[in-house]
Amino acid sequence: MRRSIRACGRGGADMSMEAHAVKSVSPLSEFWHTFRRNKVAVVALGVVIAIILMAVFAPFLVPQDPYDLKSLVLRDARRPPGYVGSTGILHLLGTDSQGRDLLSGIVYGLRISLQMGLVAGAIAFSIGAVVGCFAAYVGGRTETMIMRIVDIQLSFPAILLAFVVAAILGQGKSQLILALVFAQYAYFVRTAHGAAAAERQKDYVQAALSVPMSGWFVISRHILPNSLPPLIVVATVQIASAISLEATLSFLGVGLPPTEPSLGMLIANGFQYLMSGRYWIAIYPGIALIILIMAINLVGDQIRDQLNPRLRK
C-alpha cells in the first residue's frame, strides 16, 4: 500500500514537473520550434542571414571597392567572368560597362538594397502603426477621413506613387526612401486600423477606457502591442516590395544616381548589352535580386502562417 502511495506520489510529481516544463517554454522557443519544421523557410532564412552578413562585411569580402573611381580601368570594361584585369584582380563574375568588378558591385548593391528596404520599411511601419491605431481609437469623422485617404492611395499601384514622388524629389538615398515610404505606409495603416479596431472592442481595452488616462497611453500600452502580429507579417512583405521598388526605380532612372552600384542600376547598365552576348552584366545582378526577394518572401510566408490563427493547423 505504501509502495503504491509512493508510486502515485512520484507519478504526480513527475506529471507536475512535466507540466511545469511545458509551461516554461517561451513563446519565442515555441515559434522557432514550429518555424524550423518548414525546411524551405529555414533555408530561406539562412540565405537572408548570409546576404545580411555579406552586406555588412562587404569591404572585407570583395576584391574591389566600386565607389573608388581611381580603381576603375575603362579598358577592363565588359569583360567576361573569370577575366584577370590589368591590375591583377580576378573578376570572378566579369566586369560591368564601367570596368567595375561585377561581384563587388553585386555585393555592394545587395547592401544598398537591404538598407533601402529596411529603413523604408521601418519608417512606413512606424507611421502606419501609429496612424492606424489612432484612427481606430478616435473613431468618428477623423477615422473616416483618414481611412478614405488611405483607400484612395491604395487604389493606385505602389510603383506609380513611388515613381511620381521620386521624379519630383530627384535622385538620392533620402529622396528614394521618402518615395518608398509614401508608397507603402498606407498598407500598414490599413492593417493596423483593422487590428486595432478589433482590439478596441475587447473587454480589457474597454476597462482601460473606463479609467481616466490619456488616449496615447491606451494606444501604446494596450492596443498597439496586441496589433503587432499582423503588422509584422505585412512588414516582411513590404520589405521585399521596397527592395523590388528600389531596383525598379533605379532601373527606370529615377532612383539612385549612376555612381551608386545598386542592383537596379547594374541591371539597367547591362540591359543594353544583353543582345550583344555580354549577358553577365545584367543577368547576375538580376539573379541576386531574385534570390534576395524570394528568400524574404518565403520567410514572410512562414511567419504569416504561424501568426495568423486562421492558417494554423
Language model feature labels by segment:
Residues 2-9, 17-67, 149, 227:
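N-terminal signal-anchor/first transmembrane alpha helix
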Residues 12-23, 81-83, 87:
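Short, contiguous pre-domain boundary segments
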Residues 10, 16, 311-313:
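Cytosolic-side transmembrane-helix boundaries in multi-pass membrane proteins
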